[in-house]
């Protein structure tokens, strides 16, 4: 098995409408989030506004876990869900309009094009 040790300066951080996002991993390696050309993307983002609207991502399955802060998230046609750090994972389709309330730092898994995955918090 091959592995690669990366440092903070190796990651790309960009702005989105509610804060900043740092891409930690993308597959395939030459994938591109901006053009939605990827099968798997892992990122960590900050939500820096009290209320935000998530970026629409048609065809992308999303898994979200809060790392810091608390958030209430609501998807189009659904009920609001309160989320606390390392307690809750929210799985949702990027096709649905998603709004949130609360300033947080989160961890995201995005999959599409036949890829799948799940976020699970393992307490040691």
Please describe what each predicted stretch is.
Residues 1-36, 53-56, 73-107:
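A short, N-terminal "cap"/entry segment at the start of jelly-roll beta-barrel domains
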Residues 3-6, 43-46, 120-123:
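Short amphipathic
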Residues 23-25, 41-43, 64-65, 72:
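Short, conserved beta-strand segments within well-ordered enzyme catalytic domains
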Residues 27, 45-47, 57-59, 68, ...:
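Acidic/polar N-terminal loop/beta-strand segments that form early-domain functional surfaces
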Residues 27, 48, 110-114:
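Solvent-exposed residues in well-ordered beta-strands and their adjoining turns
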Residues 36-50:
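Short, positively charged
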Residues 59-72, 108-112:
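Short, conserved beta-strand element in jelly-roll/cupin
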Residues 102-118:
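A short hydrophobic beta-strand segment most commonly corresponding to one strand
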């Amino acid at each position: 098995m091959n592995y690669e040790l990366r440092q903070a300066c190796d990651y790309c951080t960009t702005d989105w409408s509610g804060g900043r996002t740092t891409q930690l991993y993308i597959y395939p390696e030459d994938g591109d989030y901006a053009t939605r050309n990827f099968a798997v993307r892992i990122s960590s983002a900050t939500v820096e506004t009290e209320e935000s609207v998530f970026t629409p991502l048609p065809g992308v399955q999303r898994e979200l876990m809060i790392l810091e802060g608390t958030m209430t998230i609501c998807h189009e046609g659904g009920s609001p869900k309160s989320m606390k750090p390392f307690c809750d994972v929210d799985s949702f389709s990027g096709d649905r309009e998603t709004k949130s309330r609360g300033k947080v730092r989160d961890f995201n898994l995005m999959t599409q094009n036949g890829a799948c995955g799940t976020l699970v918090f393992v307490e040691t």
